[in-house]
A protein has these predicted regions:
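A bilobed periplasmic-binding-protein/Venus flytrap-type ligand-binding module shared by bacterial periplasmic
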Residues: 116-127, 259-274, 295-298
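Immediate post-signal peptide segment of exported/extracytoplasmic ligand-binding proteins
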Residues: 22-33, 145-153, 338-339
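Short, polar/charged alpha-helical segment
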Residues: 40-58
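Ligand-binding pocket segment of bilobal, Venus flytrap-like solute-binding proteins
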Residues: 72-74, 80-87, 157-238
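Short, well-ordered beta-strand elements
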Residues: 27-40, 58-63, 153-157, 282
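A conserved helix-loop-strand patch within extracytoplasmic ligand-binding domains
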Residues: 104-158
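C-terminal lobe and pocket-closing loops
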Residues: 221-286
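An extracytoplasmic/periplasmic, membrane-proximal ligand-sensing/linker region
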Residues: 40, 166-181, 191-205, 216-219, ...
Length: 339
């Protein structure tokens, strides 16, 4: 009889505990998060999942996505609820329209610090040649960056065929009159080819100059240094010339790279149902660039996926993520991941 009573009490305890969990989950609700198809976005989605589930009691589902398909789905269907790392340059006009209509909301316009595109060099180059402080100074020294196929010219590494940045870099090459200054384009052929050219130069102690972007594991691993390209020459020059095919850009002007607009975007449904705490989390959730690049290096070196990297980040950087949530929520997260 006592055994039966104990079993009944245990069952009631379990039912009560489960009811509490259901209640907590119901308060937060079901949330869908875009799991974009590049490393930093995958990592961010997994961190969001852990924090929302362990800290806020949400039910989180990650939805595979990419920039434009995810944007279209959020705009037309209101799903997924959250795009953690949305590179808005690809659809800035459409996003602004969706925000104006109240369908979407850009609630964090700096989810990662120090990100962007442009020209980069290796730190060893600047240590040996501290005078190379700008694009003009670098372009005056093609001899320091010999082209792999013609060492008499400087080698300027650009994006693989088919990438939008290939067009921009070819037009930049003309705008800066690089051929007259003794430079030639290095056709990298693929993402692996571009990455390999950087790794090879870094490991051999050679100089390298070309296009790249952050956050990426290579920027973190080799501490690539962004080149000062001067002033931005305006939206018309960028939108209607530099970003177009060469035949549509008759008179390109020198310019810094267009500012990368990267937001955390949420659906109107999420904004209406998430509650103040959930919205505040995404508004505060900003990764320092060096931390993000470091986590991408970890993912590359350890062949870790976003889920593994999320736990590693939460263990390694509590001083970063604990600022995004109330202390009581941070305590729940620590307990949930076994800290």
């Amino acid at each position: 009889m006592k055994l039966i009573k104990k079993i009944m009490i245990s069952a009631l305890f379990v039912l009560g505990f489960n009811s509490y969990n259901v209640s907590a989950n119901a308060e937060c609700g079901d949330i869908t998060i875009a799991n974009m198809n590049w490393a930093s976005a995958n990592f961010m989605a997994e961190v969001d999942k852990v924090i929302l589930e362990e800290g806020f009691g949400c039910n989180v589902e990650l939805i595979p996505g990419a920039t434009m398909p995810t944007f279209t789905s959020m705009q037309e269907k209101g799903e997924p609820d959250v795009a953690p790392e949305f590179w808005a340059n690809a659809a800035i006009v459409e996003l602004e329209a969706a925000v104006k209509e109240g369908k979407l909301h850009s609630i964090n316009k700096a989810p990662i610090t120090g990100l962007g595109e442009g020209w980069w060099v290796l730190p060893a180059t600047l240590e040996k040649h501290p005078d190379l402080t700008s694009a003009d100074a670098i372009l005056a020294r093609p001899d320091l960056f010999p082209h792999p196929e013609d060492p008499s010219k400087g080698g300027f590494h650009i994006c693989p065929p088919g990438w939008n940045c290939e067009l921009s870099n070819r037009n930049h090459f003309r705008a800066w009159e690089m051929e007259k200054k003794g430079w030639a384009i290095v056709e990298t052929g693929s993402a692996a080819g571009l990455d390999g050219s950087i790794a090879k130069a870094a490991e051999r102690g050679e100089n390298w100059c070309g296009y790249y972007w952050s956050p990426t594991s290579l920027v973190g691993k080799y501490n690539l240094q962004a080149v000062d390209m001067g002033e931005y020459a305006g939206k018309d020059n960028w939108d209607n010339c530099l970003s177009k095919p060469e035949q549509e850009c008759a008179n390109p002007k020198k310019s810094s790279w267009v500012k990368s607009e990267v937001f955390t975007v949420v659906s109107d449904n999420y904004k209406s149902t998430a509650g103040k705490a959930g919205m505040n989390y995404f508004k505060k959730r900003t990764y320092p660039g060096e931390v993000m690049n470091g986590m991408l290096v970890y993912m590359a070196d350890q062949q870790a996926d976003g889920a593994d990297a999320a736990i590693e980040f939460l263990v390694r950087y509590p001083e970063v993520w604990s600022k995004w949530v109330p202390k009581s929520t941070a305590d729940k997260i620590r307990k949930g991941i076994g800290l």
